[in-house]
């Protein structure tokens, strides 16, 4: 199973492929960059860079409300002075954006 982050402002799509386990939960890695989608012990589902810095999270979904799978829906990211809104979509056959 793969996921896509679909950026709302310009329709840029980032695909994440399975990448083993982190903290006892499945993890995914962005196919073009060292960014991972993981379940953080305190923060819940998030994206992290290679240093482990959180740079994306579900919008308005607290960790205790999250399930064992990444939250599908609205996410926000922050990199330096820029923030973006994305939709996280679980891919099924034929549902990829590209």
What label would you give each PLM region?
Residues 1-98:
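Interface elements of modular peptide-recognition networks comprising either
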């Amino acid at each position: 199973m793969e996921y896509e982050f679909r950026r709302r402002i310009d329709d840029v799509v980032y695909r994440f492929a399975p990448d083993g386990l982190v903290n006892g939960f499945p993890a995914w890695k962005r196919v073009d960059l060292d960014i991972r989608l993981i379940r953080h012990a305190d923060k819940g589902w998030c994206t992290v860079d290679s240093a482990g810095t959180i740079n994306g999270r579900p919008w308005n979904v607290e960790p205790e409300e999250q399930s064992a799978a990444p939250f599908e829906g609205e996410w926000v990211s922050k990199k330096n002075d820029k923030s973006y809104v994305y939709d996280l979509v679980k891919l099924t056959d034929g549902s990829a954006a590209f």
